[in-house]
Amino acid sequence: MKKHLLSFFALGTAFVLCPTLATAQVENPPAPNEGIPPPQPPMEEMMTPPSPPPADNEFTLSAQIRPRFEYRNGAYRPLVEGESPAILTNNRVRLNFDYKHSDRLHLYVSLQNVNVWGQAQQVQAVDKTGGMSVFEAYAEFPLVNTLSAKVGRQVIALDDDRIFGSLDWHPAGRSHDAVNLNWTPSEKWTLRGFFAYNQSGSTTTPTLNVNTPSGQNFTPGLGQDYQHLQALHAHYNISEAHQLSLLFANLGYRTNDSADQNMQTFGAHYTGKSNQLTYGASAYMQTGKNATGADKSAYMFAVNAGYKFSPIFGLTAGIDYLSGNASDDTSGKDKKFNPFSGTNHKFYGFMDYYYVGFTPSVGLLNPYLTANVRTGEKSNLSATYHFFAPAAKFETDKKHSSLGSEIDLVYNLKVQPFIGLQVGYSTYFANDGTKALKGTANQRGYQDWFWCSLNINPKLFSAIF
């Protein structure tokens, strides 16, 4: 009996406690995945490395080798009796280092060697200059908003290269030691300022030491032609087919410690296009003083128009006028326009009779006509006729109204994506005006010039990291 009572008591206790336990289980249910390991990602995702940070650096190494063979039977000036043609091959070698860090820094260095074949011995001696020069070396970086700066040795090439040009035809090219401030306030306007201050040594101490304690030590011809430069260039996109540029430049000349002379050049350049017709015009004036201190009062203008008659044929006609001094002018003013840093080989005949080492005192009038023919998918041929005349009165023992004429032929062929071939032939038809201006009264008969150039410029290495 006692045993049955104990069993009954245990059963009653369980009955009383069961609702409480059940309620506790409902109020604190176990987590659905409690005790179950979380699912694992697919094996492919487990093996994929994390994404690298964005690449901010870009580096490119490129080179250029450009030999040019020339037969000069009257290039630069007519040959006279007793002179023989010059035959030579000049050569340009460049190694270019180009580094960019996002949009915050751009470094560019171009090392250059310029020589004539045969100048170096087969077993070369030690070259105290290292055999290389620096064509360009600059850093470009943003300042604030749309204003950036480029500092160092750099090419200054504006518009059509008429006043400031790269002079790429010359084996050495042309570069300046300058600061370039570039401001783009809108999609329509681009404003650029160029500033330079040079020292080059004097005639008595041509090697300028960086520790020179006093004196200007600047002599034209030992380094840059000018001592200081301030230039402002504004480019305005009138529309997709019409462009306008304005230029103001001040060049300061000095010889050693003498007072400097300042020459101002200012003007405008315009280009336009309508269907197959292209046209352009430029006009500039020069005031102030020239390098010798004479008053400067000169001007120039140029107009041109071209029409593409078909995909393979087009014509361009134009005229350039650069003022000069009349042969009987006794005013003492310098009226010769000076395209001081222009790529003049591009405009005034490929034989370089004018504005390449020689500025005609009487100026120049140069109407011309160019025909362009596409001879293949990778080749073309151009032919240009130039007529030359003095811009001012030119009189010696008689009046000269002409300085002769020139014909230039150039053939271009893209041999490979990084190899170009150029072949050219020019002839100059000299007359009494040419002889009087150049001082070659006893010149030889036929004057011509032939050249052939290879331009090899591969990209050697490129990396983004």
Question: Language-model segments: what does each one mean?
Answer:
Residues 2-86, 96, 313-318, 464-465:
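N-terminal periplasmic/intermembrane-space "pro-region" immediately following the signal or transit peptide
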Residues 57, 87-91, 130-135, 173-177, ...:
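Residues that define the transmembrane beta-barrel architecture of outer-membrane proteins
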Residues 67, 93-99, 136-141, 179-183, ...:
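Residues on the lipid-exposed face of transmembrane beta-strands in outer-membrane beta-barrel proteins
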Residues 67-73, 101, 111-117, 153-157, ...:
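Transmembrane beta-strands of outer-membrane beta-barrel pores
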Residues 71-91, 101-145, 157-170, 216-217, ...:
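Surface-exposed loop and membrane-interface regions of Gram-negative outer-membrane beta-barrel proteins
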Residues 103-107, 145-149, 187-193, 240-246, ...:
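Repeated loop/turn-to-beta-strand initiation elements of outer-membrane beta-barrel proteins
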Residues 278, 282-286, 291-374, 380, ...:
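Extracellular/periplasmic loop regions
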Residues 444-465:
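Outer-membrane beta-barrel "beta-signal"
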